C-alpha cells in the first residue's frame, strides 16, 4: 500500500500538460490558463519536481465526461469552434456559452486536459498508488450538468468524485475559492455519499448561491455545508473557523477520501476577489486537511492576479511535499511577472475585515448545530467495483519516446499571448462575473428537474453504463496514457 502512516512525508503525484498554457479565453478575459504554466515553471525552478512523480494527464473522452454531463452538452462542446459559432447560436444560448464562457480555439481539448488530470488523480488514489494527487488545471467548480458557468465548462471535480465513489463510501469536498462551489454542491445535493463544504463570499456576488441555510435535500439533508463570508477576511479570522469546522466535519462524517479545491481568488489583491488572505494563510487550509492523513486530491480553481496564483499553488505544492522553500524566488521563465520584490510571499492589504469575531462565531455555531444532526458515519452498501476510468496500462511511461517527454519542458517556454501579462495585472472591468451574472446563479429548480438522472449516475456504482451510444468517442489506449515525465 502506498498510503503513509501517521504524520510522515506523503507520496505525491502531480499532473501537468505542457500545452495547457497555450489555451486563451480571449483578450480582456480574466481567466488565463497561462497561470498554470507559470506555476509549473516556478515549482520546477524550486526543484520540487525531484520530490514527486510528474504525469502528463490523458485527454478525458466524451464518454468519461458524460458520466455526469448530458450527452447533448458534451456533443456541443466537441463541435463548437470560433469559425462555426453562427451555426450554433441557439445551442450557445441554451448552454450558456458566449460571454463569461467564450468559445476559443481548442476549447474541448482544454476541457479534456483539465478533466483528465483530475480523473487520473482519483484513479491513482483509488489504486492506493499515491497519498496525494495534484492537478492545478482542475477545480472548475461552476460547470453544471448541461451548462457552462463562471469560466467553467466541464466539472472535473464532480467527475473525479464519481471516480472516488467507486472505492470510497464517503467523499468530502472542501472549497476555499472565493466563489461558492455551486456546481459541485448541486451535483451531490441529494446524496449522503458526498459532503460539500464551501467557504466563500456571499451576497451580491457570483454565483449568488451558498446561503447558510442551503443544507442539502432528501438523503443529502445536512450534507451541504456553507460558510458565507464578508469582504476583507484575513488569515487570522479564516484560520479560527476553518480548522474547527473541518475537524467537526471529519468527526461526524468520517470520509475515506478528500477533494480540496484551492481557488486562489481568495488571496489579497485578486483581480476579481475581495478577501485579504496571504499565501501562507491560504496554504494553512492545505496543512489542516493534510493532518487527517486521508487520500487527498488537490485541485486549482479561480485566481485572476496570475503572479499570485503561481506563488500560491507553488507554495501549496511544497506544503503537500513537506518541503520548505525560500521566500526569494528562483530565476524562472516568467521572472519579470513577480516584480518589484521577486518574493514568494505576499503581504495583506489594509482593507477592512468586515467579518467580526461575533459574526464568525455565530455562523460557526450554526454550522455545528447542523452537523450535530448528522448520524455518525452513514452506512453505505458497497457494490461491485466498475472499471477504472484510466486503464491499468496508462501508467506505462517507458514506451514513450524520451524526446517526446522532453519536448513538454520545451513547450513551456512558448511565448504567451501579448495580452496575458498586461490584462492580468490591471483591475479593468474584470468584475463582470460578479456583477452581471450573480442573478444567474440561483438555479435550484434544476436540482429537482435533473434529480433522478443525476442520482442514477452518481449513486449507482454497480457497473458502468453499458447502454451508452457506441458511436461516441472511443477511449484509445494511446490517448489515455498517463505518461510520467522523467525529465520534467
Swiss-Prot record:
Cofactors (names): Zn(2+); Ca(2+)
Protein name: Histone deacetylase 2
Organism: Homo sapiens (Human)
Catalytic activity: N(6)-acetyl-L-lysyl-[histone] + H2O = L-lysyl-[histone] + acetate; N(6)-acetyl-L-lysyl-[protein] + H2O = L-lysyl-[protein] + acetate; N(6)-(2E)-butenoyl-L-lysyl-[protein] + H2O = (2E)-2-butenoate + L-lysyl-[protein]; N(6)-(2-hydroxyisobutanoyl)-L-lysyl-[protein] + H2O = 2-hydroxy-2-methylpropanoate + L-lysyl-[protein]
One GO cellular component term noted in the UniProt record for this chain: ESC/E(Z) complex
Subcellular location: Nucleus; Cytoplasm
Assembly, per entry: Part of the core histone deacetylase (HDAC) complex composed of HDAC1, HDAC2, RBBP4 and RBBP7, the core complex associates with SIN3, SAP18 and SAP30 to form the SIN3 HDAC complex. Component of the nucleosome remodeling and deacetylase (NuRD) repressor complex, composed of core proteins MTA1, MTA2, MTA3, RBBP4, RBBP7, HDAC1, HDAC2, MBD2, MBD3, and peripherally associated proteins CDK2AP1, CDK2AP2, GATAD2A, GATAD2B, CHD3, CHD4 and CHD5.
Family: Belongs to the histone deacetylase family. HD type 1 subfamily.
Amino acid at each position: 500500500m502506498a498510503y503513509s502512516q501517521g504524520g510522515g512525508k506523503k507520496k505525491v503525484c502531480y499532473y501537468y500538460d505542457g500545452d495547457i498554457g497555450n489555451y486563451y479565453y480571449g483578450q480582456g478575459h480574466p481567466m488565463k490558463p497561462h497561470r498554470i504554466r507559470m506555476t509549473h515553471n516556478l515549482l520546477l525552478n524550486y526543484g520540487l519536481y525531484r520530490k514527486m512523480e510528474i504525469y502528463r494527464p490523458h485527454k478525458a473522452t466524451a464518454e468519461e465526461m458524460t458520466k455526469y454531463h448530458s450527452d447533448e452538452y458534451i456533443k456541443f462542446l466537441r463541435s463548437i469552434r470560433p469559425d462555426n459559432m453562427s451555426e450554433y447560436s441557439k445551442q450557445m444560448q441554451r448552454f450558456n456559452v458566449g460571454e463569461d464562457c467564450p468559445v476559443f480555439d481548442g476549447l474541448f481539448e482544454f476541457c479534456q486536459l483539465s478533466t483528465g488530470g483530475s480523473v487520473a488523480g482519483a484513479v491513482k488514489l483509488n489504486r492506493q498508488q499515491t497519498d496525494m494527487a495534484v492537478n492545478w488545471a482542475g477545480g472548475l467548480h461552476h460547470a453544471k450538468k448541461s451548462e457552462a458557468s463562471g469560466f467553467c465548462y466541464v466539472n472535473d471535480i464532480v467527475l473525479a468524485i464519481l471516480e472516488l465513489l467507486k472505492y470510497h463510501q464517503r467523499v468530502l469536498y472542501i472549497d476555499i475559492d472565493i466563489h461558492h462551489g455551486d456546481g459541485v454542491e448541486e451535483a451531490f445535493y441529494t446524496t449522503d455519499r458526498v459532503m460539500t463544504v464551501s467557504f466563500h463570499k456571499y451576497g451580491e456576488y457570483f454565483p449568488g448561491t451558498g446561503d447558510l441555510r442551503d443544507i442539502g435535500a432528501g438523503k443529502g439533508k445536512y450534507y451541504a455545508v456553507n460558510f458565507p463570508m464578508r469582504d476583507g477576511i484575513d488569515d487570522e479570522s479564516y484560520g479560527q473557523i476553518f480548522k474547527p469546522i473541518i475537524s467537526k466535519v471529519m468527526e461526524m462524517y468520517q470520509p475515506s477520501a478528500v477533494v480540496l479545491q484551492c481557488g486562489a481568488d481568495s488571496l489579497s489583491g485578486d483581480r476579481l476577489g475581495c478577501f485579504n488572505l496571504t499565501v501562507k494563510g491560504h496554504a494553512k487550509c492545505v496543512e489542516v486537511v493534510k493532518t487527517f492523513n486521508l487520500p487527498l486530491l488537490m485541485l486549482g480553481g479561480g485566481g485572476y492576479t496570475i503572479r499570485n496564483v503561481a506563488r500560491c499553488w507553488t507554495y501549496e505544492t511544497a506544503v503537500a511535499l513537506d518541503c520548505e522553500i525560500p521566500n526569494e524566488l528562483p530565476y524562472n521563465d516568467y521572472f519579470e511577472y513577480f516584480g518589484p520584490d521577486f518574493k514568494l510571499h505576499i503581504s495583506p492589504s489594509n482593507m477592512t475585515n468586515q467579518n467580526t469575531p461575533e459574526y464568525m462565531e455565530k455562523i460557526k455555531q450554526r454550522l455545528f448545530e447542523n452537523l450535530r444532526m448528522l448520524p455518525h458515519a452513514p452506512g453505505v452498501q458497497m457494490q461491485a467495483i466498475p472499471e477504472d476510468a484510466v486503464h491499468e496500462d496508462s501508467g506505462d511511461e517507458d514506451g514513450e519516446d524520451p524526446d517526446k517527454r522532453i519536448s513538454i519542458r520545451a513547450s513551456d517556454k512558448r511565448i504567451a499571448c501579448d495580452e496575458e501579462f498586461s490584462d492580468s495585472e490591471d483591475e479593468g472591468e474584470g468584475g463582470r462575473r460578479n456583477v452581471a451574472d450573480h442573478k444567474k446563479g440561483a438555479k435550484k429548480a434544476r436540482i429537482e428537474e435533473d434529480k433522478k438522472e443525476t442520482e442514477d449516475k452518481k449513486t449507482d456504482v454497480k457497473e458502468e453504463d453499458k447502454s451508452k451510444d457506441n458511436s461516441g468517442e472511443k477511449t484509445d489506449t494511446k490517448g489515455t496514457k498517463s505518461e510520467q515525465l522523467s525529465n520534467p
